[in-house]
């Protein structure tokens, strides 16, 4: 009774619409999701080193990648990231691998929690972060244009941004891609892509975001999962695992981990990232959510 009395002092998201959370939100979750992801065949995020024995796990990751590609319009996606924040950070690191330019511009309208994670990832890698100011809750595009030069390797756009406002994505494309070596990284709310322009339509080179809204509870702040998609020519620079489809010697469809030479269990310190299976169970929730 004492615990119930203390609990009753909390304001539940079941009773009110909460606009708190900084990227973690309360959405309707069909009961079928928990039933499916709780099955013993799925209830692990671990991919065996002989991954091909787990065809079911590889297939749902493949389907997840396909869905992320359909949502973002980009041609290749990985198996997931830790969260939206780490996805942005890894995108900046990937941009450096692509163009060898070590300056990145973050908008002042970016989720401040994401900024903290990006700083943690980039400080030890010699990457300089610049902040584009905001004006009336949106990125100041004139200021952004003045900041751009040949030393800038990537620019981030978050839309909807931390304030809930929709950025002018086409303007970002025009400004950023005046420098052909600079990459535009779009951080998007995946549910918004049902009605808003997908990142590929404004030429975002990398599309990332937080996927918690797809069938995952708030869980007091985690676990979460991030999604990551890009152009096919940058596939070998991507972080994380990639599942590909193929045909076995008997002519049956099969799934395999592909481009593994990028990964930490193969190259260790020379890998594109130390991320591996990470949040795969959360991505399964997303797959079931999108299928329903």
Describe the role of every protein-language-model region.
Residues 1-63, 266:
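N-terminal entrance/gating region of PLP-dependent enzymes' catalytic architecture
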Residues 40-51, 69-73, 99-100, 122-130, ...:
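Gly-rich Lys/Arg/Thr-decorated short loops/hinges at beta-loop-alpha junctions or inter-strand turns
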Residues 214-292:
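Active-site C-terminal subdomain of aminotransferase-like
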Residues 86-250:
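Conserved PLP-enzyme active-site core in the AAT-like
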Residues 29-46, 50, 86-96, 285-292:
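Short, Φ-rich (hydrophobic/aromatic) sequence segments
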Residues 15, 50-53, 59, 69-89:
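Short loop-beta-helix segment that forms the pyridoxal 5′-phosphate
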Residues 48-56, 76-80, 102-109, 158:
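Flexible, glycine/proline-enriched loop segments at strand-loop-helix junctions
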Residues 56-69, 197-205, 253-263:
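Acidic-glycine-rich active-site phosphate/pyrophosphate-binding loop
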